[in-house]
Amino acid sequence: MASENMTPQDYIGHHLNNLQMDLRTFSLVDPHNPPATFWTLNIDSMFFSVVLGLLFLVMFRSVAKKATSGVPGKFQTAIELIVGFVHGSVKDMYHGKSKLIAPLALTIFVWVFLMNLMDLLPIDLLPYIAEHWLGLPATRVVPSADVNITLSMALGVFILILFYSIKMKGIGGFAKELTLQPFNHWAFIPVNLILEGVSLLSKPVSLGLRLFGNMYAGELIFILIAGLLPWWSQWILNVPWAIFHILIITLQAFIFMVLTIVYLSMASEEH
């Protein structure tokens, strides 16, 4: 429900502001007067992403410790289904040999899903608690709606792409891949380098921006519904959108995982 002291425009803008720290002074940034500097840290995005990552570790560790060969409980069954699904996806799509890929894919899928799931919380719940109980000027609770988080994850995948490319093909083989494809002639090396360089760099950029764009749009729709409609009518649009958004949340986590597996499989192929 929008604050009585805010116009709809103020309400929407308020919910799109991150809790930021100026790294030059280590002080909180005024969301209404942000500094014109790159050196800021989105504390809320970092906090919720770390907390959700720890939640993932605690959940899976507790299930692993209590796993039995007998009849599993409902929670253990759900975890086993997720693990089996991810393992099957890796087996079908990754053609190299690495023990890292399956755990990485599982971590990405569950972690991104949990970050996306924060979008289903009531839009004012955690920001209200943060503002009135903790005195924080702004709070955004969906880490995957922050481009810094999604591009950071994509950058991690990009580093792994480079690592596996060099590991499987060697530095010379990787250099040849960049300079002698698609035109296998020394005269086309500059053209090949531009084409392959753009293709290589587009992978992390598209990976991060796709997740960010979908989650930012979903978050914005919830904010628009809450900011423009009276409280008693919001459920008419909120409920159908939340139900549909469950599909988006799961699908975006799956796409991020699948593209990571595919990119690493391509990097692991020997030419």
Curated annotation (Swiss-Prot):
Gene that specifies this protein: atpB
GO biological process: proton motive force-driven plasma membrane ATP synthesis
Main subcellular location: membrane
Subunit structure: F-type ATPases have 2 components, CF(1) - the catalytic core - and CF(0) - the membrane proton channel. CF(1) has five subunits: alpha(3), beta(3), gamma(1), delta(1), epsilon(1). CF(0) has three main subunits: a(1), b(2) and c(9-12). The alpha and beta chains form an alternating ring which encloses part of the gamma chain. CF(1) is attached to CF(0) by a central stalk formed by the gamma and epsilon chains, while a peripheral stalk is formed by the delta and b chains.
Organism: Salmonella arizonae (strain ATCC BAA-731 / CDC346-86 / RSK2980)
One family name in Pfam for this protein: ATP-synt_A
GO CC terms, sorted: plasma membrane; proton-transporting ATP synthase complex
HAMAP family recorded: ATP_synth_a_bact (MF_01393)
Transmembrane segments annotated in the record for this chain: 38-58, 100-120, 146-166, 220-240, 242-262
Top-level taxonomic group: Bacteria
InterPro entries: ATP_syn_F0_a_bact/chloroplast, ATP_synth_F0_asu, ATP_synth_F0_asu_AS, F0_ATP_A_sf
Membrane topology reported for the UniProt record: Multi-pass membrane protein
Family classification: Belongs to the ATPase A chain family.
SUPFAM superfamilies to which the protein is assigned, alphabetical: F1F0 ATP synthase subunit A
Localization annotation: Cell inner membrane
Alphabetized GO MF terms: proton-transporting ATP synthase activity, rotational mechanism
Record-given protein name: ATP synthase subunit a
The protein's role, per its UniProt record: Key component of the proton channel; it plays a direct role in the translocation of protons across the membrane.
Keyword list, A-Z: ATP synthesis, Cell inner membrane, Cell membrane, CF(0), Hydrogen ion transport, Ion transport, Membrane, Transmembrane, Transmembrane helix, Transport
